[in-house]
């Protein structure tokens, strides 16, 4: 069948949805002009980080939310449901589109294609009260943003992250994942992490590539 233009435009944007290691654990099936099916998968068999497929499940949710945002540009709202009796490793989601005249574009629509990853050091100066309010207001009403600002709080978080990194970087299973998911000498990648997004300097990148041979 010929894919209707609005659905094609929505899916063209939806493929920008974030996923762990940019693995994009999904496939699209267009049923008709108002119904698509997302065939989800996960990477638990080979990716240490995808414990019980939860990371992929989060990616499925990010995809559905991106579809919702993209659909707003077509004056379409969505409803979705996961099919019953589908395996956790191959979840299937039915997504239906409903016309909604005058539906405003979602404020996040312009940012779908400008999605970036920041793994480098950020500025060290404290957030302003206005910035804190903006972050708090961006969360859903049922969520709370907690700011850890004291020296002891930041020290405790740093220790926790260091211990987590030590486990990841000394675990053979994680080594295999890192070797497979990085695309070296690349700024962009279709289905991996490009080297420039890893967040290391050129010399460290060369060392990493040599170690991971």
Predicted regions and their residues:
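Acidic, surface-exposed loops and disordered segments
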Residues: 1-213
């Amino acid at each position: 069948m010929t894919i209707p233009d609005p659905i094609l435009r929505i899916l063209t944007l939806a493929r920008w949805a974030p996923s762990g290691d940019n693995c994009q654990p999904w496939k699209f099936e267009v049923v008709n002009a108002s119904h698509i099916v997302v065939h989800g998968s996960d990477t638990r068999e080979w990716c240490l980080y995808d414990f019980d497929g939860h990371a992929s499940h989060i990616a499925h949710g990010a995809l559905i939310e991106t579809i919702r945002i993209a659909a707003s540009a077509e004056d379409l709202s969505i409803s979705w449901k996961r099919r019953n009796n589908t395996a956790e490793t191959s979840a299937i989601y039915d997504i239906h589109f409903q016309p909604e005249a005058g539906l405003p574009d979602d404020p996040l629509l312009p940012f779908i294609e400008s999605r970036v990853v920041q793994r480098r050091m950020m500025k060290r100066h404290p957030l302003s009260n206005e910035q804190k309010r903006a972050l708090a207001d961006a969360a859903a009403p049922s969520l709370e943003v907690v700011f850890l600002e004291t020296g002891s709080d930041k020290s405790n978080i740093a220790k926790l992250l260091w211990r987590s990194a030590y486990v990841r970087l000394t675990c053979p299973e994680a080594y295999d994942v890192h070797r497979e998911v990085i695309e070296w000498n690349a700024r962009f990648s279709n289905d991996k992490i490009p080297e420039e997004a890893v967040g290391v300097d050129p010399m460290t990148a060369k060392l990493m590539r040599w170690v991971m041979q």
